[in-house]
Amino acid sequence: MKPLIHFAHANGVPSKVYQKLFDQLKDQYDIIYVAEIGTDKRYPITHGWTYLVDQIIDSIVQQSQGRKVIGLGHSLGSVLTLMAAYRRPELFSQVIMLDPPFIIGKASFAFHLA
């Protein structure tokens, strides 16, 4: 059985846009994904992204058939995936974050002031 990837896309870039990436991975991995983050009224966009994290978790639970996933996310999707893994670690074998929007070090102080 191939490892299972759950993919979460970047802000405003639906998962289908990543089809060429999925095509490159499909020989070695099974791939599931959340189609569109932030457009489903059951998962409103709120401070702290709580409901968007719920959307990631629900997507995994509904599609994984009980298998642990490699959580793969791009930008916003990577942060939501990390938050989902923190909340429900039993769903994940690992997390891979592509281009996470983290600002660390001295520069982060200026963003906290903004």
Task: Please name every model-derived segment.
Residues M1-K2, D27, Q65-R67, E90:
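Active-site acidic short loop of glycosyltransferases
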Residues K20, M83-R87:
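Active-site signature of alpha/beta-hydrolase-fold catalytic machinery across serine-
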Residues K2-R42:
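Conserved HGGG/HGGXW glycine-rich cap/lid loop of the alpha/beta-hydrolase fold
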Residues G73-G77, T81:
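Gly/Ala-rich beta-loop-alpha elbow adjacent to hydrolase catalytic centers
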Residues Y86, V95-A114:
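Flexible "cap/lid" loop of the alpha/beta hydrolase fold
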Residues Y18-Q19, R42-H47, K106-F109:
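Conserved catalytic-core motifs of eukaryotic protein kinase domains, centered on the activation segment
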Residues I70, S93-I96:
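Residue in the alpha/beta-hydrolase core beta-strand immediately N-terminal to the catalytic nucleophile
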Residues Y33-L72:
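Active-site loop/oxyanion-hole signature of alpha/beta-hydrolase fold enzymes
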